[in-house]
C-alpha cells in the first residue's frame, strides 16, 4: 500500500491509499480537481471514499468524483448522508477496502458525528487530531473531545497519523507558549519550522512521537499540570484539556 497526500485549498490534505494494482481509496476529498489530476497522472482506479465529517472542505468534491467514477462506495458518518455518502458507518463497525479492514472510531468534538478510520498503521483522523494540536470544538464539548483524543492516543505506537490540515507550525508555536523549556517540543518545533520554510509537508506523524509533543495528549503530564496550576487548580484531565483548548482558541 502506498500513502499519498494531495494538497487542497490553503492547508488541506486529501489522503489517498493505493495498492500495486492501482486501486485507490480517497479520504475527505474537499475538492475534486486535484484528486482527478492525481488519478489521471497515476492511472489509479478509485474504489472508495472515506468521509470523516460533514464540513465542506472535506466533502465538497464527492459528487463530482462519484459522477466520474459511479462505482465508488462512499463511507461516512450519519452527518454526511446528504453529502454523497452511500454507506453510513458508525463506531465499532468496519469498512473493507483494498483488501484491508478499517475500524471506524467515533470521535465527537469537532463535530458531533465525526469519525476516524484505522487500519494498522494508517489513522485517518480528519479534524480530530492534528500534529501538535486538535480540532476546534464547533459542535462538541471539551469532555467529548478529550475522550476522543484518549481513544486515538491508545492506538499502537507505530500508527501513522494522517491529519487533514497543515497546522503543525502554528500548533507548535502554541505548545512552546505553554511549555517553553520542553526539549521534545523545542526539537520538533525546529524540525517543523525547517520543513515549512521549504514548503514541505509535516505529515504523517508517528503516534509515539506525537504523544511527546502534543500538549492536548499530555493532560496528565506533571510539567503541564504545574504550568496550569500556576493559573488555576484543575483536578481532572478533562478540565485541563478544556483550559488548553480555550487558550488555543485565543492564541
UniProtKB/Swiss-Prot annotation:
Binding site for Zn(2+) 1: 53, 55, 110, 127
EC number(s) stated in the UniProt entry for this protein: 3.1.2.6
Pfam families cross-referenced by the UniProt entry: HAGH_C, Lactamase_B
Keyword Zinc tagged: yes
Enzyme's top EC category: hydrolase
Pathway where it operates: Secondary metabolite metabolism; methylglyoxal degradation; (R)-lactate from methylglyoxal: step 2/2
Keyword entries, A-Z: Hydrolase, Metal-binding, Zinc
Cofactor(s) it depends on: Zn(2+)
GO biological process terms, semicolon-separated: methylglyoxal catabolic process to D-lactate via S-lactoyl-glutathione
Coiled-coil parts of chain: none
Sequence positions that bind Zn(2+) 2: 57-58, 127, 165
Details of cofactor binding: Binds 2 Zn(2+) ions per subunit.
NCBIfam families found in the cross-reference section: GSH_gloB, PRK10241.1
Name the UniProt record assigns to this protein: Hydroxyacylglutathione hydrolase
Organism field: Escherichia fergusonii (strain ATCC 35469 / DSM 13698 / CCUG 18766 / IAM 14443 / JCM 21226 / LMG 7866 / NBRC 102419 / NCTC 12128 / CDC 0568-73)
Taxonomic path: Bacteria, Pseudomonadati, Pseudomonadota, Gammaproteobacteria, Enterobacterales
Amino acid at each position: 500500500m502506498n500513502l499519498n497526500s494531495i494538497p487542497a485549498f490553503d492547508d488541506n490534505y486529501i489522503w489517498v491509499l493505493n495498492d500495486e494494482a492501482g486501486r485507490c481509496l480517497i479520504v475527505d476529498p474537499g475538492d475534486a480537481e486535484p484528486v482527478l489530476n492525481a488519478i489521471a497522472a497515476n492511472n489509479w482506479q478509485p474504489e472508495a471514499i472515506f468521509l470523516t465529517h460533514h464540513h465542506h472542505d472535506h466533502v465538497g468534491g464527492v459528487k463530482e468524483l462519484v459522477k466520474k467514477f459511479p462505482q465508488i462506495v462512499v463511507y461516512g458518518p450519519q452527518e454526511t448522508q446528504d453529502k454523497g455518502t452511500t454507506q453510513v458507518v458508525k463506531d465499532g463497525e468496519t469498512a473493507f477496502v483494498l483488501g484491508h479492514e478499517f475500524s471506524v472510531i467515533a470521535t465527537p468534538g469537532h463535530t458531533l458525528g465525526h469519525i476516524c478510520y484505522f487500519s494498522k498503521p494508517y489513522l485517518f483522523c480528519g479534524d480530530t487530531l492534528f500534529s501538535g494540536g486538535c480540532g476546534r470544538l464547533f459542535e462538541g464539548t471539551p469532555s467529548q473531545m478529550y475522550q476522543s483524543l484518549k481513544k486515538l492516543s491508545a492506538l499502537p505506537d507505530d500508527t501513522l497519523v494522517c491529519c487533514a490540515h497543515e497546522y503543525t507550525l502554528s500548533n507548535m508555536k502554541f505548545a512552546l507558549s505553554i511549555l517553553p523549556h520542553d526539549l521534545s517540543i523545542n526539537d520538533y518545533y525546529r524540525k517543523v519550522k525547517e520543513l515549512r520554510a521549504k514548503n514541505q509537508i509535516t505529515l504523517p506523524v508517528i503516534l509515539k512521537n506525537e504523544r511527546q509533543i502534543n500538549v492536548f495528549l499530555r493532560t496528565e503530564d506533571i510539567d503541564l499540570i504545574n504550568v496550569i496550576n500556576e493559573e488555576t487548580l484543575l483536578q481532572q484531565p478533562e478540565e485541563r484539556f478544556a483550559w488548553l483548548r480555550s487558550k488555543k482558541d485565543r492564541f
